[in-house]
Amino acid sequence: NFVTLARSKFYDNTIFHQRPVVEVGQKVKKNQLLADASSSDMGGLALGQNVFVAFMSWGGANYEDAIIISERLVKNQTFTSAYIEEFKTNVRDTKLGPEVTTPDIPNVGEAKLKNLDEDGIVRLGAEVTPNDILVGKITPKGETELTPEERLLRSIFGDKARDVKDTSKRVPHGKKGKVIGVKVFSRERGDKLESGITKRIHVEVAELRNVSVGDKLCGRHGNKGVIAKILPEEDMPYMADGTPVDVILTPLGVPSRMNLGQIFEMHLGLAAKTLGYQAITPPFMGVTDAEIKSELVKSGYPEDGKVKLFDGRTGESFEQNVAVGCMYILKLDHMVEDKIHMRSIGPYS
């Protein structure tokens, strides 16, 4: 039996994508994994990425929990995510006549209409930008007293010359992407629609968003922060063997919050990555600090997990040794592209 859940706003713009991990004809056993989701790998939750981090200040750019990341994460699309938005439009039967979906929109240039099919609906795979038409739609306007010229046009062209206004569904400002789905619900086909609505059209637009300044990242220990700077790879601090760090976190975010788990995770992650194994440890009753020190020594690092780092801009070493390691980082839904806000010119109130 499947448990049904009421759809909530929390899941807006979220993709649920399952894929099978077994093949037709394959014999399966009890408790064997049958399918994976886009957020899991072999049954384990996989929402983030392992990155190489350092706890240090960097010219004040990571002040107040701000995060500095390497341009390498942008180039490799490490934190790129797919974002899907659904746009809906209704075709109504008005008092002045029915609305019509059509690619023949008055006073709109050919360039804006090139992606519309014969019904005025945008085609699959079209790249759309702000103010592009998704569904071309015209609505009858109230008839006014006709001028002699309009009367002549009406007698020549008939209904085509009547008064209509453009009520097309357009891409809102700040949105862009590729059309990946179109659904048409029509009363003629037997679909149940509210009274007065003859047709409803849903258009899904997908956008790939790479990580950028203003996006929010977090770890597994409530250690969240906003990206303040994206540095070129060559400017990032690097180890003696030339390995640059991917993320610079502020050390001032740890003592007051007392979430020391991130420090243990970083040190154990460094040892596990170097020795080539995956460390699975439950919270509160897992690996001890003595075991972490032992693993660090085995992997060739000092037992305190601190190494000498060099400034990528000058090539000089930093005065103090720096704690470095491998940490699991997730990208949160708070993306800077959704945070835009504006006000019209006017008095302050």
Regions found by a protein language model. Give the residues of each.
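Intrinsically disordered, low-complexity regulatory segments
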Residues: 18-349
